Amino acid sequence: MNWKRFIQFSGVPPSQASLALGMIGLGQAWDLYLPFYGDLIRPYLAGIGALLLLPVLLKYTTNFRTFISDLRHPVSGSLMAPISMSLLMLCDYLAAVSPIIAYPIWFAALLLHLSMMTLFFTFQLSNFKMSHILPSWFLYPVGLISSSLAGTQFGYTVFSSTLVNTCIAIYFFMLPVVLYRLVFEGALSVRAKPTLAIMAAPINLSLASYLVNFPNPDPILTGALAGIAVTMTLFIYLCYFRLLRLQFKPSIAAITFPSVISSVAMYRLTDFFDEYHPHWHWLHKFGFLELTISTGLVIWVSIGFIKMYWPQLGQKS
């Protein structure tokens, strides 16, 4: 194996952070649905996610010019959001294991996310074109909600609940804008097409975070979020039939974490229904189906990345 390919950070695609986010989230999903197995594999998936994220972090910390250049691009820049989101999700796990380690990482990741969001939208608005808008643009303003998961464990309940409400409001504002772009501003480029899968990520992340941070959730808002979440999840499943036919590119990693987040949100929703509407418990089976699909997607994309770094593995001797 040519291990130099893995340590040449300048060539690491930023979308590798999307796979890292999918790995970390998958550990949480398994821990929710099958705690016996989840407790065993979650630390390993979190570790693999951290290892996937590390080269991306090193790429940008060692070359600030590349960081700014990628952040200016409407596709690459938006797909850099999972870098900080992965750290925030990792802190959700670490907060229960080692709060002393988790807190400084959480605070640094929160500052990183806010900084990247400010720079990204400043660059995009200075050269704004409606055709540049992508589903991945949701990730900065709505993805910030992922900081509320560890924030609640650190005792910042007011911060977390306020952030959840704010991010949900931003989502409802951005949704018609993104849909307008997808309908009336032409087809997405081949590189940007995998971002269609991200349509399911912000709403499911909002639903999961809302149910975690509010002990007495509003049934109307919960129903609205759940309805859109299920619709968007089914939409991206239809998209998979086309996206999985595309030639493998690193940006295809964007299909992993939305499906993972959808399974987590469905578990939170069925947990809520168990208490208030037990006749909806059958949705738990749908959530388990989502977990199965997301696990398969993470494995498939992981194999693609392995072949990308070590192409000789796929060659016949």
Residues covered by each model-derived region:
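Structural signature of hydrophobic alpha-helical transmembrane segments
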Residues: 40-54, 99-114, 158-173, 219-231, ...
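Generic multipass alpha-helical transmembrane bundles of integral membrane proteins
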Residues: 108, 137-238
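A generic transmembrane alpha-helix motif of multi-pass inner-membrane proteins
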Residues: 58, 267-307
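Hydrophobic, membrane-facing alpha-helical anchors
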Residues: 1-6, 51-66, 109-125, 145, ...
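Juxtamembrane helix-loop boundaries in multi-pass membrane proteins
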Residues: 2-27, 64-89, 106, 122-149, ...
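N-terminal signal-anchor module of multipass membrane proteins
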Residues: 1-57
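Membrane helical hairpin/interfacial module
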Residues: 35-101
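Helix-coil boundary and interhelical linker segments in multi-pass alpha-helical membrane proteins
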Residues: 28-40, 92-103, 149-161, 210-221, ...
